[in-house]
Structure formats: C-alpha cells, structure tokens
Amino acid sequence: MFYKIAQKVMFQMDPERAHHLAIGSLKMTANSPLTCLYGQTIAPAPVSVMGLTFPNPVGLAAGMDKDGESIDAFHAMGFGHVEVGTVTPRPQPGNDLPRLFRLKPAKGIINRMGFNNKGVDNLVKNLIAKKTDIMVGVNIGKNKDTPVEQGKDDYLICMDKVYLHAAYIAVNISSPNTPGLRSLQYGDLLDELLSAIKTKQLELAEKHKKYVPIALKIAPDLTIEEIENIAQALIKNKFDGAIATNTTLTRDGVSGLANANESGGLSGKPLTELSIKVIKQLAICLKGQIPIIGVGGINSADDALAKFDAGATMVQIYSGFIYQGPKLIKEIVNAYRLK
C-alpha cells in the first residue's frame, strides 16, 4: 500500500529526481523503525551460485544504488543480494540531462546515464559502513575518458579496491552509454581483458586469502556467434559467472510511445523475450560449466521462472521493481520455492 502511494507521487516527478529522492529516503530510514513502511520478511530459499550461498535467488540489479548508499534498506525489503555500481576508478558526472525516461504503457525505461557515480573510494566507504550482512556484488566499469585500449587498467584498479568488501565482482562491458565500451565484448580485446582480470583475481586471492568470484555482464544485442565467442572466452579464462543481460539498443514493442526515440538502453518489460533468448543460447554454449544470473524484463514471478527455465540459476530485478515494488521480490521467491 505504501509503495503504491509513493510510486504515484514519484511518477509525477522527473525520473532522475524521483530516483535521487528514493535513494536518499531509503538511506535516511534504513536501520530505523521506518523500515516498516517498506520492509518485509521472506522465508529463506537458499541458492548456491559461484561458490556462494545466497538466502534467496532474487537480487537488485546494478544501476539502482550506484554508490551503495541504501544497501541496508534493500536488505530490509528481502533481496537475496544487492549489486551496487556501476562504479569507476574516478568520480564522473555521466551524460548530460535529461538522461532517464519512463515508458509507462510498456513498463519500460530508457537510460543514457553514462556511469555517473562518486568513484570507487566513496563506494568502499559505504560498503564498510553498511550494518547488515547482505551479500553485495560490486559492478565495475571504466571511466569515460579512459581509452578503450587502456580500459582494463580501470577494471583492475576497481578490483583492487573493492575486493575485500565484495561478495562477488561484476565486470560491466555491456552498457551502451559509454562510447566504445561494448567493443570490449569482441575478439582480442575481450580475451585480453578477461585474462588480465583473472590474473588479478588470483593475485588478490593469494594476497588476502579470500577468493571473490568474478562475473561478466553481457549485452542482449549479440548474434549467436558472438554469444558463442563470449562463452568460450569465459570458459577459457575460468570466470565464475555470467550476468545476462544489460539494456538493449533495440526498440521492439515500444515504437510510437512517448520517449521511445530517446537514445540509450531500453530496460523493463520490452526486454523480457530478448533477454530470455540470450540466456538460452548462453546456457547452451556454457554447457553448465558457468552459472548464469538472469536479468532483463522481469515484471512478474512468471517472468522470473522463465529465466530459470532458460538456464539462469539466480535473477536480478530493476525496472520491474520500480513498476511493481517490493512485493515482486516475495512473489518470485515464493514461486521459486514451489517450482
């Protein structure tokens, strides 16, 4: 009930202003009696992924809490894990405003945020300050002004700084809003990046006597051959997981809607089928050797079950969470428990 009222107010506001208000409000109310307004108890439905045991298979996707400011509030809602970021080595403002658009009739969102964040050092402070023991993944990227050829250096810097504070690390090379970033998904650039990250992971594991899994987040706008090549690179470099998928540059199902022609990545319900298609193909190529976290267009428990059926071991929500609220978490967990 509270979420429906809050949503009605938020949806009258500019989307990015509403986002900042929501994160700020959650930050203020976390670990206080006011969590009763949005908190809920969800019976455990444990799932093992990447060598980790999560209390349930529903996580918050990266992009909602970029700087890790409201982690404890999302824990109160019942998420099995929270993925913060995308974070970059240095703070950056992101792309020009406006850069976030709702497509309400289609339950979609278009964003061209551009990795706006306060930098990895600020994120680490927030990870240290959190009071709950929720599993937190850290999604890392490169700064906009770092040449693609030197992009791996930014990922290694972020890895070094977040390693001790992350349950797992997600490598984001699939955002469409950082020029040239998606080129890291192909050929020699992909293999060089994954190899460098794996080497760094093993060095940090030896140094800290702690193994932190690494997952790669991929785009939905890939051919079968490109998915096969990514899968082979993941297996070759012994990555721990894959996250499929990021937002799409296609506009299937939204043509004619207000804001549909805005540039950026489309998420939400219009992404549902494309994401499932990629997960199915990726699962075939990975042959069970590497687990998949399914994300993209989950607006109901049935959408989540379709991700599991396609080959995902765990799921994440973002746009569906904005449109449906915290009840979606419980609905998915209950459906997962019964499947």
Curated annotation (Swiss-Prot):
Enzyme class: oxidoreductase
Catalytic activity as recorded in UniProt: (S)-dihydroorotate + a quinone = orotate + a quinol
Binding note for cofactor: Binds 1 FMN per subunit.
GO annotation, biological process: 'de novo' pyrimidine nucleobase biosynthetic process; 'de novo' UMP biosynthetic process
One CC-aspect GO term: plasma membrane
Subunit structure: Monomer.
Task performed by this protein: Catalyzes the conversion of dihydroorotate to orotate with quinone as electron acceptor.
Designated name of the protein: Dihydroorotate dehydrogenase (quinone)
Source taxonomy: Bacteria, Pseudomonadati, Pseudomonadota, Gammaproteobacteria, Alteromonadales
Gene: pyrD
